[in-house]
Regions:
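A short acidic, Gly/Pro-enriched loop at the edge of an enzyme's catalytic core
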Residues: 152-164
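Conserved SAM/SAH-binding beta-strand->alpha-helix loop
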Residues: 128-132
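Conserved SAM-binding strand-loop segment of SAM-dependent methyltransferases
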Residues: 142-153
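Conserved alpha-helix/loop element of class I SAM-dependent methyltransferases that forms part
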Residues: 71-96
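Conserved class I S-adenosyl-L-methionine
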Residues: 96-107
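Conserved SAM-binding loop of SAM-dependent methyltransferases across substrates and taxa
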Residues: 108-120
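Class I SAM-dependent methyltransferase Rossmann-like catalytic core
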Residues: 55-79
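N-terminal auxiliary segments of SAM/dcSAM-dependent transferases
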Residues: 1-54
Length: 164
């Protein structure tokens, strides 16, 4: 949900902070840029002329989700979750602040959702270039905010805003 992670996000044009407007139907930057939130719950944060690449199409995203649901990658998701937990355990995080996680190339949110299930109160930002993947990502977990962005450009993330 974008309202849970908006403080992590940044305007892709100039890095200024974003805030929700019009009941979070838009995100607006301090410098006046505005980004519409899709009805499916994700936001596209692209600078200038927009995204240069399209990412996975709907068939590719559906095929990936079907394959992941078969459990073939269960050992990998367990390893990723364990590594994130170890990293957070060794970090000096304030106990009163929930951990903030970022997954770049998040796809449908398979890894991020599983990791959030294992880390109480943590919140996550999933970035992917595919709007089709972002539709799934936005629904994968109640503590995930889904963002369509080109990771070859400036990440739309505030400096020092994520823990893992």
């Amino acid at each position: 949900m974008l309202s849970h992670i908006v403080d992590i996000l940044a305007d892709p044009n100039d890095g200024t902070a974003l805030s929700g407007a019009d009941d979070f139907s838009r995100l607006v930057s301090e410098s006046g840029h505005s980004y519409d939130v899709a009805k499916q719950g994700y936001v596209t944060l692209a600078a200038g002329a927009g995204l240069k690449h399209k990412g996975d199409d709907m068939d590719m995203v559906n095929a990936r989700e079907t394959y992941l649901a078969m459990g073939h990658f269960a050992p990998f998701v367990e390893a990723v979750t364990g590594a994130v937990q170890d990293g957070l355990d060794s970090a000096s995080l304030a106990e009163s602040t929930p951990a903030s996680l970022l997954e770049v190339g998040a796809g449908t949110g398979y890894y991020l959702a599983h990791t959030l299930d294992s880390i109480a109160e943590a919140r996550g930002v999933g970035l992917d270039i595919s709007p089709h993947a972002a539709k799934h990502l936005a629904k994968c977990h109640p503590r995930v905010g889904a963002v369509v962005a080109d990771v070859w450009e400036r990440l739309p993330i505030q400096d020092e805003s994520v823990d893992a």
